[in-house]
């Protein structure tokens, strides 16, 4: 079902965990402002997006730029492994332990009313408690997506060691 004049990522399914979304470039951030998974509602710039979500996007875009222009890495969506994918979904939710996760396999996109694409997406999860002004979790998890595009090798000493090393530019 297409709803004219509504962003493809504007309205969540009534049973969805996330009640809001914002998209910039290849990133689509899904979040809620209510309940256990809520991000703080502060919106200093008045753009109708919580500052926490804005800050996650800023860090993701900066990391994406850094990985491509300073390290010469090919963006994940340009790798043959992920050519069928059309974006990177970032799900902001509560974590009892840890601060983030990145997934290596493309999956069905988060369903939103008015969505026109059924192409698989890559997924990152960021803890709603993570403050990207103080934490490098978004950049760290995005680097894992870059790693997975290059190699299926997922041994922790390799993936975590490299990702932690690359947190330095964002610290």
Predicted regions: what they are:
Residues 1-27, 33:
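N-terminal low-structure segments adjacent to metalloprotease catalytic domains
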Residues 25-158, 162-163:
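Juxtacatalytic substrate-recognition/specificity segment
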Residues 170-171:
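Short helix/loop segments within enzyme catalytic domains
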């Amino acid at each position: 079902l297409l709803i004219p004049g509504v962003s493809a990522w504007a309205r969540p399914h009534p049973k969805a965990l996330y009640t809001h979304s914002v998209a910039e470039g290849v990133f689509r951030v899904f979040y809620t402002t209510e309940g256990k998974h809520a991000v703080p509602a502060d919106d200093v710039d008045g753009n109708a997006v919580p500052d926490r979500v804005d800050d996650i996007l800023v860090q993701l875009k900066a990391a994406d730029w850094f990985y491509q222009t300073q390290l010469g890495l090919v963006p994940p969506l340009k790798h043959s492994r992920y050519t069928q994918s059309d974006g990177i979904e970032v799900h902001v939710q509560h974590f009892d332990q840890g601060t983030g996760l990145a997934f290596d396999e493309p999956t069905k996109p988060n369903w939103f009313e008015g969505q026109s694409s059924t192409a698989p997406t890559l997924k990152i999860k960021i803890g709603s408690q993570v403050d990207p002004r103080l934490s490098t979790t978004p950049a760290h998890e995005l680097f894992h997506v870059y790693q997975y595009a290059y190699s299926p090798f997922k041994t922790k000493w390799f993936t975590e060691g490299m990702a932690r090393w690359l947190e330095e530019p964002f610290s």
